[in-house]
Amino acid sequence: WRDAGADVQGERVRLPKGLARELIKTAPSEYTQHARNPDRNVVVGGRNLVLAPVYGPPFVRDAAGGRRYATMDDFKKFVKLGYMSKWLHHSGGTVCEPTDVPVNKRHLDMLLAHMQLSDKPFMGSVTEPSRAQDSVDMCGILFGKEFVQENTVMTSLININSPMTFDDVMMGALEVYAANNQACIISPFIVGGAMAPVSVAGTLTQVLAEVLAGVAYSQL
């Protein structure tokens, strides 16, 4: 940030007027995310609509067991359902949290399920920078390393720890994906009145500031 012209005081970064917008100008207004099946490629941005499954629920519900923690078997079933749906363009990412798989390898199993059980585009892991790199490496096996470096094959979700905080885990994952030409969604995790002002106007102002900072950082 300092090299780009921002005022950095400890962990606080202040962006001068216009810096964020100048950096954001270097990002494309739309891009194509490539799928294993080229017919399933999606264009993100512009006036395009891309529908994907829900992201991150720890619980599932079925007719026999009711509400319970999700398993890897549940995850695979949701990936299959997403693949079968004509209404969904995208396979998503963490369609549920498979709690029966250790956290340090869970991302590998989830990504493999998306790759094997669907030919739609998918999202990478963001729960640790090394897991983001694992996602890039797995895509290198699926698509070819050169193809991954020249094309977008993942769109991953980066959460901002509102108010106005980017933690090292999410920023590390963002840096990995940006360095490998992969796209990210910058999403502030905000509840009005808790991590943001009570008013709608105040909350939206904070959302805009956090998103501008996150997108600008990804373009550094």
Predicted features and spans:
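Glycine-rich, N-terminal phosphate-binding loop and its surrounding beta-alpha-beta segment
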Residues: 3-65
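Helix-rich catalytic cores of soluble enzyme domains
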Residues: 66-220
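Short low-polarity hydrophobic stretches
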Residues: 1-3, 114
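Short secondary-structure capping/turn micro-motifs that flank functional sites
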Residues: 1, 15-18, 131, 193-194
